Amino acid sequence: MNPIVKQFKYGQHTVTLETGAIARQATAAVMASMDDTTVFVTVVAKKDVKEGQDFFPLTVNYQERTYAAGKIPGGFFKREGRPSEGETLIARLIDRPIRPLFPEGFFNEIQVVATVVSVNPQISPDLVAMIGASAALTLSGVPFNGPIGAVRVGFIDNQFVLNPTMAEQKQSRLDLVVAGTDKAVLMVESEADILTEEQMLAAVVFGHQQQQVVIEAIKEFAKEAGKPRWDWVAPQPNTDLINKVKAIAEARLGDAYRITEKQLRYEQIDAIKADVIAQITAEDEEINEGKIVDIFTALESQIVRGRIIAGEPRIDGRTVDTVRALDICTGVLPRTHGSAIFTRGETQALAVATLGTERDAQIIDELTGERQDHFLFHYNFPPYSVGETGMIGSPKRREIGHGRLAKRGVAAVMPSLAEFPYVVRVVSEITESNGSSSMASVCGASLALMDAGVPIKAAVAGIAMGLVKEEEKFVVLSDILGDEDHLGDMDFKVAGTREGVTALQMDIKIEGITPEIMQIALNQAKSARMHILGVMEQAIPAPRADISDYAPRIYTMKIDPKKIKDVIGKGGATIRSLTEETGTSIDIDDDGTVKIAAVDSNAAKNVMGRIEEIVAEVEAGAIYKGKVTRLADFGAFVAIVGNKEGLVHISQIAEERVEKVSDYLQVGQEVNVKVVEIDRQGRIRLTMKDLAPKQETEINQEDSVEEQE
């Protein structure tokens, strides 16, 4: 085995590509490394196409092995299970830029598997996996019009940073991943701390320029290690069949695409399609229905795109920059903490915000260690939202991806945990869908958060842009419909506030998208976003002044960190009894900060007073009311402040001589005692003699709570 190795500098990092030593039975295999983060990527492509195959079966799997970080998986089985949300998102990140680079009509099955086998905590594996996948596909010989490059762009101290480390990313106001060929950008995925449109575009251009070093290196690598290019020829169009479909359907489809209501339009199109299939197969039963459907779909595309390029109204009658009618309702669910329904045309999202305590935070076990997520965002896309039946179960890749995009859009305006000590979960239920449901989720989430009283920094809105490009002519579309997304050349989603962009996602199906086109799209998106924000601000101009009556209220108090063990108690007994008896939730930080969550304010005051008692210092000479906890021959043990026990010796129970302790005291009896002494070991000596009732020092719970508040 003589491996072929290609090494090159990529910003501050060194990238190594190696092939020829491992997985030699795969169509292609590349070990890609960047400063000790290593991802092994394989490509297997089938030479034969399944009979009747009418789509491109590309599968991308991304998997992280815990041994990469020197760890053993948890759980009973001690092995990796189903893909995590993070793994699913990275698989999509790899898939999105490579899928458009396979030629139309190529239906051979291809599987890309990226396995993380070593990880440097400072280098994220996602970029390495994308570079490895690009290299493996380029080596494989399949008709792949790559290679692609991939880059991460940060923004620190008003400067773009190429492939920042994990430490640098924490300081960055931008996390932007760009992938593209030597000529054009194909994909953008980003999250930003309210940057301007100009800054976002500059970051995309910067990233595309910097990734050229990757593309050139892979080309050189392929010259040395690449397999012969497949002798694949695109199937010739069946002119006779195309003309037959046109003759039957073209005029009728033109009329159907003037129906503005989605369901009625779809019913009409389905009827035309069924008629076309019936007429043509009646003449020739051997004709493949799939080919008829492909030609029918291409005809739909020609009609819709041709009208848009010609400047005619869009499918629903709008101009290119018009946003569909908006309808907003807040506070729609009576017992939830915050809710809103956001409707844009035939797309509708029911967004619900829920407030929880720190113990509700999601613990995410990553290769580099555990972290807690205090802002959760879940997106659900049930089949009824598009008038269909279907399976309902765990979220699919698309739902996970859309939820993450919507979360990115809102994350920049969320308050810190110090400003708002709640874990926040937003769920977006898509109840209707006809394009841009993820951006409807951003708008709905912003409204629901404000309805819940979450002090977000500003309202956030999202908009999806589209593109139709024919040679030198192009038209940018605002607020695209589902059909315009399907038949167009670009899906360009922008979320942001009035001040700037918080998230940008772009998927491009063609080459030739210039910075000029992206600038027009960003400017048009900004105009649409301002319009939507104006309507949202009329519905709810600012976050509610107070949280819901049904949400837990968090009360904070400070105690001496040395007293934490007293509040927790042996085996957690004390804190458990406090929470069970008062119906509250208690979290204690290492610095002595105690957070009490309770729906009932009286319960919170009660537990705060009891904690004050527990941590209060016992003073020598002070008189307390206590409770007898146990009896002994030599005296009685009495619990005073915070259940601290002291001993009343038999000689200190009464003025007269006491023969038997039980003649004077019983377990559970309340008595007044005076602290005689606290020795070096913390033992408390008590007396019941010489007490002056008027001078009792008793802890008053209500007073102590009021002092804390």
Swiss-Prot record:
* Ranges for domain KH: 552-611
**Protein location:** Cytoplasm
User: InterPro entries in the record, alphabetically?
Assistant: ExoRNase_PH_dom1, ExoRNase_PH_dom2, ExoRNase_PH_dom2_sf, KH_dom, KH_dom_type_1, KH_dom_type_1_sf, NA-bd_OB-fold, PNPase
Q: Which domain of life is it from?
A: Bacteria
GO BP: any one term:
RNA processing
Q: Which organism is it from?
A: Haemophilus influenzae (strain PittGG)
Cofactors needed by this protein, per the record, are:
Mg(2+)
Domain S1 motif stretches: 621-689
Alphabetical keyword list: Cytoplasm, Magnesium, Metal-binding, Nucleotidyltransferase, RNA-binding, Transferase
- What is the protein name for this chain? Polyribonucleotide nucleotidyltransferase
Q: Name one Pfam family in it.
A: RNase_PH
Assembly, per entry: Component of the RNA degradosome, which is a multiprotein complex involved in RNA processing and mRNA degradation.
Q: Answer whether the UniProt record assigns the keyword Cytoplasm to this protein.
A: yes
**Record-stated family:** Belongs to the polyribonucleotide nucleotidyltransferase family.
Q: What does this protein do?
A: Involved in mRNA degradation. Catalyzes the phosphorolysis of single-stranded polyribonucleotides processively in the 3'- to 5'-direction.
Task: Decide whether keyword rRNA-binding is in the record.
Answer: no
Residues that bind Mg(2+): 485, 491
Which SUPFAM superfamilies is this protein grouped with?
Eukaryotic type KH-domain (KH-domain type I), Nucleic acid-binding proteins, Ribonuclease PH domain 2-like, Ribosomal protein S5 domain 2-like
Show the GO cellular component annotation of the record. Answer: cytosol
EC number(s)?
2.7.7.8
